[in-house]
Amino acid sequence: MAGIEGFAAIRGKLAQSEAAPGIVLIACAALALLIANSPLAAAWHALFHHPLPWTPVAKLDTLHLWINDGLMAVFFFVVGLEIKREVLAGELSDARRRRLPVLAAVAGMAVPALIYLAITAGQPALHRGWAIPSATDIAFAIGVLALVGRGLPPSLRLFLLTVAIVDDLGAVVVIALFYTSGLKLAWLGASALILAALVLVNRMGVRALLPYLAGAVALWYTVLHSGIHATVAGVLAAMTVPLALNRRHDSPLLRLEHALVAPNGFVIVPLFGLANAGVALGADFGESPALPLGIAMGLLLGKQFGILGSILVAERLGFAHRPEGASLRHLWGIALLCGIGFTMSLFIAGLAFPETPMLVEEAKLGILGGSLVSALAGLLVLRGSGRPVV
């Protein structure tokens, strides 16, 4: 019992710190958008994309690359820690409780992708972007949920977090399987050896953090050169960090996650937003609106239909039950908030169209538009959820 209480206490502290980073991220996204449409736009672009005078890693020769391939690996490391914690000691550890959020997350990824592919059906060059509207931004969504105020069932926030974590796991799998090219076997072999060494360290019962952190950096370096996106290394390394509590109720994973929550939420993700969210609203993106429209509709409509539809079907079939105290309107609002793609969607957009900056800019427009409308709609629906609903 003491072990379970220890997990719950640290889990509670982590949960309490999730709203503020979302609000900071919203502010950074707004600032990036403002600068991109101001006389400072050219200087801002040069700041992130001009070659650095010196870099310790030749492949990362701009600030933008260091943020997207370097700092974002730390972001994915934290995502990996969250996933492992939830699977072993959280909501996803109970088969009955994980049914609904897992089903909702899978449907919430599949339906947006199908809507995107339907809208871009006549343009095969755009099909690589199918995963862009499938993502959910945990920090952004929790930040908006915090603006609703009190009066919502506690189970709703937990449901949103669990769906978003499963969604993150799906995004990691998608990145590893569909956005990998030019594999280099020697670097892959080196990555496999480092990962095996980390697993061995775990099996030996080592609880000091230094071996895991050193191994994570080495794994990131080899994966960066292997052809697989470097951020995947963050998730793989996180999976080797031990979760189990010792007699003093100390868990290396929880200790590490707790230490990284603030840097991740207040430094890494906001920097990513500043470097990637800016888009010139008056720019000429070409004749076809299919790319931004497909992304926006995938986020706004796909998430609603996928998540809310899967919940209703699961209830009707007796497969799962809605969160305690949640009404249909509550769940509709949560489905809308899951349409806030932002961080992960922007990240996938860069992977989908690495050689075509114009398509990335178009994708940004769809991501920002779809995420903004989803956020506002979700806020309105949840703020009015005090009225009698089914």
UniProtKB/Swiss-Prot annotation:
Membrane-topology annotation of the record: Multi-pass membrane protein
Places the protein is found: Cell inner membrane
Positions of transmembrane segments: 23-43, 63-83, 100-120, 129-149, 158-178, 181-201, 208-228, 265-285, 293-313, 331-351, 362-382
One Gene Ontology term from the biological process aspect of the record: regulation of pH
Gene Ontology molecular function terms on file: sodium:proton antiporter activity
Top-level taxon of origin: Bacteria
Record's catalysed reaction(s): Na(+)(in) + 2 H(+)(out) = Na(+)(out) + 2 H(+)(in)
Pfam assignment, any one: Na_H_antiport_1
GO cellular component, one term: plasma membrane
Predominant cellular place of this UniProt entry's protein: membrane
Protein keywords: Antiport, Cell inner membrane, Cell membrane, Ion transport, Membrane, Sodium, Sodium transport, Transmembrane, Transmembrane helix, Transport
InterPro entries named in the record: Na/H_antiporter_dom_sf, NhaA
Transmembrane as UniProt keyword: yes
Function comment: Na(+)/H(+) antiporter that extrudes sodium in exchange for external protons.
Family, as annotated: Belongs to the NhaA Na(+)/H(+) (TC 2.A.33) antiporter family.
Family matches, as HAMAP family: NhaA
Protein name: Na(+)/H(+) antiporter NhaA 2
